[in-house]
Amino acid sequence: MGFLIRRLPKDSRIFRWLLILTVFSFIITSFSALFGMEKSIFRQLKIYQSIAHMLQVDTQDQQGSNYSANGRISKVGLERDIAWLELNTAVSTPSGEGKEEQKKTVKPVAKVEEAKEKVTVKPFPEVMGITNTTASTASVVERTKEKTTARPVPGVGEADGKRTTIALPSMKEDKEKATVKPSFGMKVAHANSTSKDKPKAEEPPASVKAIRPVTQAATVTEKKKLRAADFKTEPQWDFDDEYILDSSSPVSTCSESVRAKAAKSDWLRDLFLPNITLFIDKSYFNVSEWDRLEHFAPPYGFMELNYSLVEEVMSRLPPNPHQQLLLANSSSNVSTCISCAVVGNGGILNNSGMGQEIDSHDYVFRVSGAVIKGYEKDVGTKTSFYGFTAYSLVSSLQNLGHKGFKKIPQGKHIRYIHFLEAVRDYEWLKALLLDKDIRKGFLNYYGRRPRERFDEDFTMNKYLVAHPDFLRYLKNRFLKSKNLQKPYWRLYRPTTGALLLLTALHLCDRVSAYGYITEGHQKYSDHYYDKEWKRLVFYVNHDFNLEKQVWKRLHDENIMKLYQRS
């Protein structure tokens, strides 16, 4: 090498260095080939790869689910990522920020935007009958945005495609802003509902179905279905205290009636509604009523219930000629007062000797496990109305048969009042109306056919179903427990006995209550038919203290008579 350099002319330095670099490169290449090092040394020089191949290599390890079988980017994956980003932006927005923050979306990065323009749309394998097509992502996305809405944050309702804030009880200090009035004329379509429901959204085209995300799915023109789990406390609406009133029933002529006394009471004057609709039937049910009552959880409405089930049950309930059926049945024009005894199952009745006094009333109301045999001297024998929920009826027959309650009260003149507290009540009532076995999983272990619980002369004209409006009115105005402001608000409802007593106060002129909780209840067993003393346990699903206070006040204001022991 030195010899060659010395023989070169001095003015050829450029040529000399080029020769040195060439020889040096040749030597390095030769040694690399011998030891297999050419890949690592020249790997950085491979820069002429296609954009599609780079996306495949760079991304496939991180998001393999976003790719189709042939290695090209799947439109489904891109749309899922965008929906996921938009959803997380909405969820992470602090509640104190304005509505503009809730509408914020994330724009995809430039590399994804470039790739989306030339993607091949490949549907999921389970989507049958859809041919693979190549389409512009931008146009598909635009069509999709018109048909889809992002899943809202809990506490946010969807109405006509616009997001509105659902009021929660904790926001009462700003009541005007905290309540929402929906449009009842709007048909309801339930998101992610697999049940056979009434209103169905228009079927989207196959291309839209194919690209709909699986996990972070947007709903196609569907109003968000209200769920109790989305509310930390009982939701409040600006129509929460509005009810259907009845103007067709006769007016009481009794000057000492509950209505007359309530009108003179400073406490009840603005609370008591003497003409509220008590019972529901097919004439009270339509799409508008479904939309309204779907905002309230059972027994106060239809939240989370299936429209088809509710509609089938309601359509089979015969119309009630009169809501005030006792006043309508009064045959005399002479001013008389209708007296009613409402018999609870409290231990205070044990050895009370109230049986004869109870039977002296015009009508006697009994509830759930109304054991009579062996306790006639304490609770009487007469029954005019029997109130229950599906569960309280079947469980009482199951658990109290050995104590004498082997069948529900039956007779020619007995009427039944059903308080529909949950979906199982609608399933049970449907089976009763159709005279069929109840569906498996809905109280069927207590007996398959509900009609077997009634006598052979049973007709639906003897069967009354409490209107959800009426039950919500009782809860809102008389038994609004503080438990409704707690996370377990959905568990609370007034006791079945409380619902029956308040129903009697809206049907009768004079009411006497027996076997209800009073001061000093600790001295008595839970039930009058208990063979051994059992303490009354206060569970969160009922508010016995509140009921005790209400009964005491009604008694003190001479609205009703409450049986108490000194």
Swiss-Prot record:
Domain of life: Eukaryota
InterPro entries: Glyco_trans_29 (IPR001675), GT29-like_sf (IPR038578)
EC number of this enzyme: 2.4.3.3
Membrane topology (Lumenal): 38-566
UniProt GO BP: host-mediated regulation of intestinal microbiota composition; oligosaccharide biosynthetic process; protein glycosylation
Tissue expression pattern: Heart, kidney, testes, brain, liver and lung.
Start and end residues of each stretch annotated as 2 X 8 AA repeats of S-S-S-X-V-S-T-C: 247-337
Broad class of where this protein is predominantly found: Golgi
Function: Protein sialyltransferase specifically expressed in goblet cells that plays a key role in intestinal host-commensal homeostasis. Conjugates sialic acid with an alpha-2-6 linkage to N-acetylgalactosamine (GalNAc) glycan chains linked to serine or threonine in glycoproteins. Generates sialylated T and Tn antigens..
Protein name: Alpha-N-acetylgalactosaminide alpha-2,6-sialyltransferase 1
Originating species: Gallus gallus (Chicken)
